[in-house]
Amino acid sequence: MPGATAVGITYAGGVILASEKRIAYGNFLVSKNTRKTFQITPYVGAACAGLVADMQILSLQISALAKIRKMDLKRDIPPNSVAKMMSNMMYERRFFPLLTQVIVGGVVGEPAIYTLDSLGSVLPDEYAAVGTGAEMALGVLDPQFKSGMSEKDAVDLAVRGIRSAALRDSFSGDGLDILALDANGAREIAQAA
């Protein structure tokens, strides 16, 4: 599976999803500006690691399903429902899996994140990292995460985690995409490379 690093962090009132921008296959650097963080609904997003085509099709299909579900229910779809829809789609393809790991996060009520593997296992947590740089990122997140931290602290922690991974993982690097989700919706946070 191609490498990448993505992290998700809950904070007081919201969720930060972040990913780096590099795509590399073996020794070949394919792109330095690839989006691996996606807005699924106005209040839910996903950060992915793995094959970019699989990330893109999964996020587009789940976004469409979430819009249909919202019209049916006449209310916003919470992150756990988006994660479950994604899990079902990934499990249906278990014999020809989508080669991606995903962190789904958002705020409809309380902030929440869920980690999914390529077969659709759903694991809730307060913070997570996926991809080939996950071990290095978790080495930063584990000792420094504090429940109820501020948005600024969560963004800083996400940046430190991904930068730590990029130092040791040749499949990660070339800048960051950061998506903040709170009760007001999703917004991108500008970040220097």
Curated annotation (Swiss-Prot):
Residues 1-4 form a propeptide. Component of the proteasome core, a large protease complex with broad specificity involved in protein degradation. Keywords: Autocatalytic cleavage, Cytoplasm, Hydrolase, Protease, Proteasome, Threonine protease, Zymogen. GO terms for molecular function: threonine-type endopeptidase activity. It comes from Cenarchaeum symbiosum (strain A). The formation of the proteasomal ATPase PAN-20S proteasome complex, via the docking of the C-termini of PAN into the intersubunit pockets in the alpha-rings, triggers opening of the gate for substrate entry. Interconversion between the open-gate and close-gate conformations leads to a dynamic regulation of the 20S proteasome proteolysis activity. Gene3D superfamilies: Glutamine Phosphoribosylpyrophosphate, subunit 1, domain 1 (3.60.20.10). This is Proteasome subunit beta 1. GO terms for cellular component: cytoplasm; proteasome core complex, beta-subunit complex. The active site is at T5 (nucleophile). Belongs to the peptidase T1B family. The gene is psmB1. The keyword ATP-binding does not apply. The keyword Phosphoprotein does not apply. It catalyses: Cleavage of peptide bonds with very broad specificity. Its EC number is 3.4.25.1. It holds the Pfam family Proteasome. InterPro entries: Ntn_hydrolases_N, Pept_T1A_Psome_bsu_arc, Pept_T1A_subB, Proteasome_bsu_CS, Proteasome_sua/b, Proteasome_suB-type. The 20S proteasome core is composed of 14 alpha and 14 beta subunits that assemble into four stacked heptameric rings, resulting in a barrel-shaped structure. The two inner rings, each composed of seven catalytic beta subunits, are sandwiched by two outer rings, each composed of seven alpha subunits. The catalytic chamber with the active sites is on the inside of the barrel. Has a gated structure, the ends of the cylinder being occluded by the N-termini of the alpha-subunits. Is capped at one or both ends by the proteasome regulatory ATPase, PAN. It is found in: Cytoplasm. Its main location: cytoplasm. GO terms for biological process: proteasomal protein catabolic process.
